[in-house]
Amino acid sequence: MTTLAAYRTRIQNSLDDTNSKYSTSVIDEALRKVLNEYTRANPNFKTHEHTVSAAGRVQTLSAAALIVITQLVHPYDDTLTDPFVYEREDFTLSYMDGSPTLYFFGGDIPQVDEIIYIKYAAKQTITDLDSAVATTIRDDHEDILVLGAAGQAAMMRASGLNEQWGGRPGEMSALMSWGNNQYSNFLSFLQEIKQEANLPIFPDSIWQIDEWDK
């Protein structure tokens, strides 16, 4: 998997930055922005097993960078023939004091030592960016992140040129236009992968309609 250092090199090459006009901090910030956009379109899916330490409807999770839960099983027992038989939808997820917190409104209240299994969408990461220890980006999506980050970096630099003396006529507008085009191509790609993503956002359970609505 590609590390931050490799991404920096590729972004600089895309910018044809032979004179080091783009600082590492600018490139990292540009990459950070496109990574966040990429996550919204194509999150990284992970699993987490939460052992209940205190019985109750409210359970605080330690799962990092949790965006949305796509599957929850309680009680979870991996020794069963079908450990996912007790899948639940009678819960809400909210952030309380910065921590993902579950609230179960059904009749089955989690008890001490029971296990809650969750599958969830999480933030995508790149090794060494913001201390991440793994790169989760698909290899075939790397090119488009480089394209988007190069576009972001160009627009950031163009904004700075507006405050500088001695710039060449038209340099700022040309750079801004180029950067915007690259970033627009990146956003178009995100629309494509959103359509490919299989992210269940609707519950399987339904309410019966009233007799007069049938």
Q: Model-derived features: where do they sit?
A:
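Glycine-enriched, solvent-exposed interface loops adjoining structured elements
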Residues: 1-214
